[in-house]
A protein has these predicted regions:
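Cofactor-binding beta-sheet edge motifs in enzyme active sites
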Residues: 1-752
Length: 752
């Protein structure tokens, strides 16, 4: 993938072409008619590439994002439907096919700051060109609502409405400005005429969509900002929803795999004789190692793989257990997690080629003049995604083509990755995307899709490949382990005069280690310390690590200053009104300052991520060293909550996911391989351990933020700070399960 510069973007020649996510319909050539055959049935008319109308006046929104429980497809349909003035009872949605015309612009959106703001609502051609070139149809980064929705679906809905008005005006021979719309109806009061949208859909579809349709103001919204039933819930409740593992193809066989346990390993010796004797086993095949398999993370050290194909999953699993394989690990089978963190420590201390995220003021002078200097070091482990539905895909390769059934976060990217692995043109791969039983970033990487396609090509039969839970835990693209070192100066007035932070390694997003607090001198930076552990996006990416680090350290500074943690933060946020409002709200709703019984504690944390501000207060009870999370209170400012109930659900989901990680989550490396294998040693939060969660939404009117990830980063530091409040023990590394909290230990080997 070549590097896109601002000049390259501008010289694509399509910047001034039209409305953002109306897609190719706004570029020269108007390709809506060409796409109609791809996404429309006989009784449907594609008005523009994102919405179609049928003869019963039902509007179907075509959504270019995958559904993995986050409810984005419903919320995106809300945004289009509101601008279209559609009757919500006559709105449904379907996922866009994985073709370049429905690419999205997740990565391209990062250059918005370099594009004149006047073009932001109308630079579809720019982003579409970038998205197509990169093979992007990504669901991630909490961008579905704040980008596709805000700059795409709203404009598409408004454009469709204007096109339908224009079509009615031409037919009725009346001025367009005299026509009103309401609940999927066109109304001309002067002539007492009324007609459903469907009546003019065919005429509207022949028009060029307007490049800058008029959008509603917030006080005009009828669907945006209101709770509506999620359209995917009923089928998930009654069991009719289709996930990738539900797929059945005539003649289908099953496969399971084992990749080299030590990353980058290759097969040295293979004995499949016992496996082939098991009833139902059809074949045992091998798949090559690879250094590039697509997805956000690319691929690092992907070893060779053994696959057993059988008439059912169970005989495939039995066959895999019977395979005897010796691996060539190329000397990588002697290192451990302890060695990795020791390497991190050496590299931070050496500081070679340190890069700055933020450098301001004079940190050295602040340290020299400090009344008190506070230092601390934190670390977090590698984490697996632990999706409830393990990785799986069904593939059929025949006659120079491939058909694949899968649940993934980047259908277009997966299609291209599978094509490349098979040596096909992308047009020869048909991909059907299904609901996912969890994604969290793991299903943005295409390794499991490629495996299914390669096995199917080898056996020349449809193959459903299913990873075991053990494979799912041990062959993940993990959230990176990080070590982070801090030093701060407190002056004679009790103010934080400087903030220093060095960590390993830099990932995404760039702003994750930055702080919102008013500290004059700051030196925040990182050093490279690469390992051979595959890494990838994990719910809220680097915000989870750095949120824990920075919000724990600011709490330590409050304690060193003898200050209340909430009031200390509030003083440092005096010039950040949105941050302060969220902090004040969570403190108020949590009853901050109210006394707690001995053994109980309360902690607070604040993190801005993906355009959304979240503050959380955690209340815990510590009994005989065991921590019970009793209550979590969250305040969230997303600018505008498109679906308030959906937003709350995502914040609560993020809290539970983050609590699992903070309390139990840990992937450790032993002899070069992952030691954990299943939920007995990679524990997740269970229902009896789940706290009461209260979520309070602030619609500040700021830019629309994300929802799927911002609930996660603040929970770990709030929990750690609550434990300190209850016990006096400062938690500086996770997970919490590794601590013995029966004693008030401020410093120990575990806490260092």
């Amino acid at each position: 993938m070549g590097k896109w510069t601002r000049r390259a973007f501008i010289t694509t020649g399509v910047v001034a072409g039209g409305g953002f996510a109306l897609g190719v319909a706004l570029r020269p050539g108007h390709r809506t008619p060409e796409l109609a055959s791809l996404v429309s049935k006989d009784d449907e008319t594609l008005v523009n590439v994102w919405v179609k109308l049928d003869q019963d006046n039902v509007a179907t929104v075509i959504v270019p994002h995958s559904e993995m429980g986050q409810g984005a497809q419903t919320a995106l349909a809300q945004m289009l439907a509101d601008e279209m003035d559609a009757d919500w009872d006559l709105v449904q949605f379907e996922e866009a096919p994985p073709v370049s015309e429905y690419a999205n612009y997740l990565l391209g959106y990062g250059i918005v700051g370099e594009v004149p703001k006047v073009l932001v609502p109308t630079f579809d051609g720019l982003m579409l060109t970038v998205a197509q070139s990169m093979g992007m149809q990504i669901t991630g980064g909490s961008l579905s609502i704040r980008s596709t929705g805000q700059y795409g679906m709203r404009i598409a809905g408004a454009a469709a409405r204007e096109m339908l008005i224009e079509a009615a005006a031409e037919t009725w021979q009346v001025p367009a400005e005299e026509i009103q719309t309401k609940a999927s109806q066109l109304i001309h009061s002067a002539s007492n005429r009324r007609a459903p949208y469907a009546e003019f859909a065919a005429v509207a579809a022949q028009m060029m969509p307007p490049s800058s349709p008029k959008l509603k103001s917030a006080d005009e919204f009828k669907i945006i900002g209101h709770d509506v039933p999620r359209r995917d819930i009923p089928s998930k409740v009654d069991g009719s929803a289709q996930f990738a593992m539900d797929v059945q193809v005539p003649g289908m066989v099953y496969a399971t795999v084992q990749r080299a346990p030590v990353f980058g390993g290759e097969i040295a010796k293979l004995d499949v004789s016992a496996a082939k004797k098991i009833t139902g086993v059809i074949d045992v095949v091998t798949l090559p190692s690879s250094k590039k398999e697509g997805g956000f993370s690319g691929a690092q050290n992907i070893g060779e793989t053994v696959a057993v194909v059988a008439e059912g999953y169970w005989p495939a699993k039995q066959g895999m257990d019977a395979v005897l394989v010796e691996w060539n690990n190329f000397g990588q089978d002697s290192f451990s997690s302890d060695e990795i963190f020791a390497q991190f420590d050496r590299d931070i201390t050496a500081g070679l080629d340190r890069e700055n995220d933020r450098l301001q003021g004079d940190v050295g002078a602040a340290i020299e003049n400090a009344t008190k200097v506070v230092e601390a070091e934190y670390r977090v482990p590698y984490l697996a995604h632990a999706c409830m539905e393990p990785m799986n895909a069904t593939a059929h390769v025949h006659d120079g083509e491939c058909e694949i059934w899968i649940g993934c976060q980047n259908p277009l990217g997966f299609r291209e990755a599978v094509a490349a692995a098979l040596g096909f043109e992308p047009e020869k791969v048909t991909l059907h995307n299904y609901f996912m039983g969890g994604g969290f970033g793991r299903r943005a990487t295409s390794d499991y899709a490629i495996q299914a396609a390669l096995v199917a090509a080898k056996v020349q039969r449809p193959v459903q490949l299913i990873w075991s839970r053990e494979e799912d835990i041990r062959q993940d693209y993990y959230r990176p382990a990080v070590r982070s070192r801090f030093r701060a100066a407190i002056d004679a007035n009790g103010d934080v005069a400087s903030w220093e932070n060095t960590y390993v390694d830099k990932h995404e997003p760039a702003e994750a280690p930055l702080i919102p607090y008013a500290v004059g001198s700051q030196d925040i930076g990182y050093v490279a310390s690469p390992t051979n552990i595959p890494f990838g996006p994990w719910r809220s990416v680097d915000h989870t690590q750095h949120g824990f680090f920075t919000e724990s350290f600011i709490d330590e500074l409050a304690a060193a200053n003898g200050a209340d943690p909430y009031e200390f933060r509030a003083q440092l946020l005096r010039d950040k009104p949105r941050h302060l409002a969220v902090l004040n709200k969570v403190a108020e709703e949590a009853g901050w300052g109210r006394s707690l019984a001995p053994g109980r504690g309360r902690g607070i944390a604040l993190q801005e991520s993906f355009g959304t501000l979240v503050a959380e207060v955690v209340e815990v009870t510590v009994t005989d060293g065991d921590v019970k999370v009793d209550r979590v209170v969250a305040a969230v400012d997303p600018g505008l909550a498109i679906s308030p109930d959906g937003l709350k659900a995502q914040i609560e989901s993020g809290i539970i996911y983050g609590l699992s990680a903070a309390m139990f989550g840990e992937v450790t490396i032993k002899n070069g391989a992952v030691a954990q294998s299943n939920f007995h040693d990679y524990q997740i939060l269970r229902m009896p351990d789940a706290p009461v969660i209260e979520t309070h939404v602030i619609n500040s009117g700021g830019p629309v933020g994300g929802a799927g990830e911002p609930g996660t980063p603040a929970i770990a530091p709030a929990l750690a700070n609550a434990v300190f409040d209850a016990t006096g023990s400062r938690v500086r590394q996770l997970p919490l399960k590794n601590y013995d909290l029966k004693f008030r230990i401020e410093e120990s080997d575990e806490v260092a």
